[in-house]
């Protein structure tokens, strides 16, 4: 039977196995945006909203976290999070949500504008008798981008402590 979504494409099926385990203490892509969260050339329209959802597991030894959303092959930053303190956690679940809205669409070149916001949430570990979960908000920076070429939404993470982040799934859809 054909797909009968109440949402709009791009229609990219989520991965059927875990993506690469991430362990760097420097900035790194959480997944390959060109593969898992693409936005095809000329698909964006003024007012169109793209939604990215992802989840997996995370292990941390405390430290800090920064989450940075980016657009397209040039890596245009859409507003990094504040530097947030993290707790120690072992194999905690995480969930990420990011919505990107195109405000204007222009001619070829960086003549279209978009803005987005989202969050990454994961359970807290027990540190000195506390069990604080982390919710890291990011985005909010309006950006000028080129929508006449293939683009993508890439979410990047920077964790300062020893860490293991396993993206288990990621999806993209548009609401309109």
Predicted regions and their residues:
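Surface-exposed molecular-recognition determinants
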Residues: 2-176
